[in-house]
């Protein structure tokens, strides 16, 4: 069935549609109140099927590449909106606007249910009337919190109030020892209110920190003074300067988006009780468009607002101010009402103080774009994109390796490089216990398990596989089977005498990639090439992480083997068990009948008794 015939079958229902090119690559995901009307509006059908005349240049180019269309029917437009957002985050279509780094930002919070409340940081929101949240913060949250503890004598650690004796923090005058009842709850509450003032007023916090820094310097405590200096810089960098006070107690969120030079940024500002308390920003991914297209503000705001409010929000605003007029305002308000059972208005103010606030957000967009565009030198990400024909700049990279010893303690590792951190994101590292016996199957098992988690942790921009062309083809087959738009390269040692030598100096690294025409090619770059060195750094970190986890698992296995041998279970029987179950954790959970399929009843009983009574 050709595309024109397929389009004639579109239903009159709400749903989500997907466009694919001639190679089956996903181009675009959209939603519709009536699929038939929306999808057909992209095309004109006479004299032959072609893009409609009134499309924007970006969408016109996309439609000219469309070879097939699929759709999913849902009960209503709201469900279509939610499904569209979920699929875009997971599948990363070429022509959709995406957040460069789709992450959850931290909040500072205080729980007033505690007798002596502390300030702390979290990314998880609990629904509780006793907890007050401040944020979110894209930068500076930890520095701000540490600074407040530096100048306000709050309870320093959770364990402090559980003790019965004043600790070192009391001796150095950083805590007032509520553990010894040296301060009442009422007096301590005033200290907490003082601490919160510094969150509301960062200028006051910075002024106090400068006083403290000067004091440290005069006391020749230069290391502590330098620490405060660095904190001040981070807090200043994160602060949007504004003297605007709405003179009301309104809670308002502000979203502003601007774009130029194939870069786009969103700034979010949060007013609580009429005062600006925090802000965050994200760059949008539009670098994968081949030409300078007119930026689609409608889609950008839709992505930004749905992505943000699809999470748990500690304090819902009365209204959301936006910097541009939107045609989809009613749809977004309906989404917010359904999501939170609360009416939240989206307003594009034209005058007065609310317009001033929106203009501040737009000015900060311009400043962030200016800084981004001032990075004149070609970045490593741009060089990698050009060299390997990547669809997008690889700001978020996942690298994979596996490790085992003679088939024992087989593990896989995934490490993550994040451009916004300019280093490895070790909190995002993952390791896998693998059951497969050969390297090809092990990599397949690991990549499939990673793809299964895309709904929770969306796909990165680039995968780096530790292996050759065979594993690269495997990875492409896997991602294409689920329709994910994802660039992949592989790095392997050059083979000498049919062996790949890892030792330095023995062989060079070869990078394998796939061209736009679907051909698999390779580069043998000079060892001094910074593009090679960057990819090697990713591979080496994945290898280190895999080896470290393998050694840990191997030690645990060796311990189990030794103890089982003491119980009379020989090495040959242990190998049979591992061959059948794959790992000790599964042997430990096996039933008597399952163990009997491998060993005799006596040995099965011995093993069952051993693991029933075993303590780590």
Curated annotation (Swiss-Prot):
The molecular function GO annotations come to: DNA binding; excinuclease ABC activity
Q: What is this protein called?
A: UvrABC system protein C
Give the multimer and partner information: Interacts with UvrB in an incision complex.
Functional note: The UvrABC repair system catalyzes the recognition and processing of DNA lesions. UvrC both incises the 5' and 3' sides of the lesion. The N-terminal half is responsible for the 3' incision and the C-terminal half is responsible for the 5' incision.
A GO CC term? excinuclease repair complex
Task: State its location(s).
Answer: Cytoplasm
Q: What region holds the UVR domain?
A: 203-238
**Which Pfam family name is an example for this entry?**
GIY-YIG
Q: What is its main location?
A: cytoplasm
Organism in which the protein naturally occurs: Aliarcobacter butzleri (strain RM4018)
Q: What's the superkingdom here?
A: Bacteria
Q: Give GO BP annotations, semicolon-separated.
A: nucleotide-excision repair; SOS response
Ranges of residues in domain GIY-YIG: 12-97
Protein family: Belongs to the UvrC family.
* Keywords noted in UniProt: Cytoplasm, DNA damage, DNA excision, DNA repair, Excision nuclease, SOS response
